[in-house]
C-alpha cells in the first residue's frame, strides 16, 4: 500500500490533520492606527486573570500591534488607569504556589541566630568587683572598731 492510497493518514513528516484556525489581528481588521491607553475596557481583554499581558499566540495580534498594546497597557498601569494585579490575586495572595501537600510536609527548620549574653557577662563581672571593694571596707571598719 503506498502513501497515496492512504487518504486518512498524514504524509510522513506532515503536521497532521488538525490545523488551527489562523488568528487575525483585531487591530489590523479594524484598521486601528493607534492603540489608546485610556481605553481600559479594550486593554483589559488582553490581560490574563493573573494580571499579565497575554502573548501573541493567544490573542492573535500582529507583532506591531502587540508592541503598541504592551506599551499602552504599561502606560495605563503607570498612571493608575489599570491595576498591575487583579483584585482576586490581591486578596488571596499568590494562589499558584499554594499546594495541599505543603500542609502535610513539615516546615523546614530555620536556624535562629545565637545571641551571646555579652551584656549579662559584663554585669556579672561588675558584681564581684563591687563585692571585693565592699569586703575590704568592711574589714577596715571592723579592724577600726576593734582597735
Curated annotation (Swiss-Prot):
Ribosomal protein among keywords: yes
Family the UniProt entry places it in: Belongs to the bacterial ribosomal protein bS18 family.
Complexes and interactors: Part of the 30S ribosomal subunit. Forms a tight heterodimer with protein bS6.
Highest taxon above the source species: Bacteria
Gene Ontology biological process terms, A to Z: translation
Keywords: Ribonucleoprotein, Ribosomal protein, RNA-binding, rRNA-binding
GO molecular function: small ribosomal subunit rRNA binding; structural constituent of ribosome
GO cellular component: cytosolic small ribosomal subunit
Protein name as catalogued: Small ribosomal subunit protein bS18
Main function: Binds as a heterodimer with protein bS6 to the central domain of the 16S rRNA, where it helps stabilize the platform of the 30S subunit.
